[in-house]
Amino acid sequence: ETIADSFASFLYKNGFTRIFSPKIVLAGAEGGANIFQIKYFDRIAYLAQSPQFYKQYGVGIFGRVYDIGPVFRAEKHNTSRHINEYISLDFEMGFIDSYEDIMKTEIAYLKYMIEQLKERNTFELELLETRLPIIGETIPAIKLSEAHQIYFENTKKDFRNEPDLSPEEEKYLTIWS
């Protein structure tokens, strides 16, 4: 609850407008993603796998938008890092200079969220013996090509021409970082 509440309050205070995207849609929002098909009265519909389409429309109207809600991914996974349904905290900003504007917003939100968790969830944090991270002014980031290269140099397995990280690379880079 605190995470979703802090997300909403932080973005609202920073000029974002909340949108409520539909969860039953006539087509997928992301090309290539597997989506859950359902019968919707006399036609076929799908469970939304992303609010992306609606966020982009919202940016054209409001400039900055966010959405909190369930998303559904009909992708077969065999990892503990993926699930088929989760609550997505999504935001979209228009008229930015670079991806760094988005990263600055994310860092500021993470700091705010951690403050809120410390204030509102002391009991739970102590019960779970959880220590929250300290967020600095920047978060280390590397380019995809650099991630592939680091993995290749250390394992000799070559994914350098792939458009995304493999599950092996994700695991390795988590430990590496």
Predicted regions mapped to residue ranges:
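Extended, domain-scale alpha-helical bundle/helix-rich regions
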Residues: 94-102, 107, 148-150
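Hydrophobic face of alpha-helices
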Residues: 4, 8, 103-110
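Low-complexity, flexible helical/coil segments
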Residues: 54-57, 84, 101-106, 123-130
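Context-gated lysine
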Residues: 13, 23, 39, 55, ...
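Metal-assisted phosphate- and nucleotidyl-transfer catalytic regions
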Residues: 30-33, 108-177
